[in-house]
Amino acid sequence: MSIPFSNTHYRIPQGFGNLLEGLTREILREQPDNIPAFAAAYFESLLEKREKTNFDPAEWGSKVEDRFYNNHAFEEQEPPEKSDPKQEESQVSGKEEETSVTILDSSEEDKEKEEVAAVKIQAAFRGHVAREEVKKMKTDSLQNEEKEENSEDTGFTSRTHEK
């Protein structure tokens, strides 16, 4: 007898989730009519690629997941054992210099990326504004033409009162 709402969890082999994610992504991208045949062709191409390049996406994905879930970089580190104060100072100053350089490099790269993104956003907005102006000009000109046609059809002309 099975329990319909059981609290059991099945263990999925490492890397299998990544393979299924890749297949799902390609199915959504390609929208094939025959999904099982497409999946078979997709897995065959992955096997060929793995044989040619010695790169296994399932293995790579399992390593990435393992690194993500087993990363101990953010745990508290034990204080280093006491040694010569001069050595500690040189080690600390060297680390500070390295981190400051990498922070500057990354911030410069980030600034460049932000500038490129800002230019793209500004260009898109300017294009949007220009399209709206053109649309407004078209509707204004159509309305003016309709008014002129209506005034000609009725025979009435608009008078301006002169003083």
UniProtKB/Swiss-Prot annotation:
Classification via CDD domains: DD_CABYR_SP17, IQCD
Location (main, coarse): membrane
Keyword terms, alphabetized: Membrane
Stretches for region Disordered: 57-115, 129-163
Tissue: Testis- and sperm-specific.
Cellular localisation: Membrane
Domain IQ intervals: 114-143
Function: Sperm surface zona pellucida binding protein. Helps to bind spermatozoa to the zona pellucida with high affinity. Might function in binding zona pellucida and carbohydrates.
Protein name per its UniProtKB record: Sperm surface protein Sp17
Native source organism of the sequence: Papio hamadryas
Gene label: SPA17
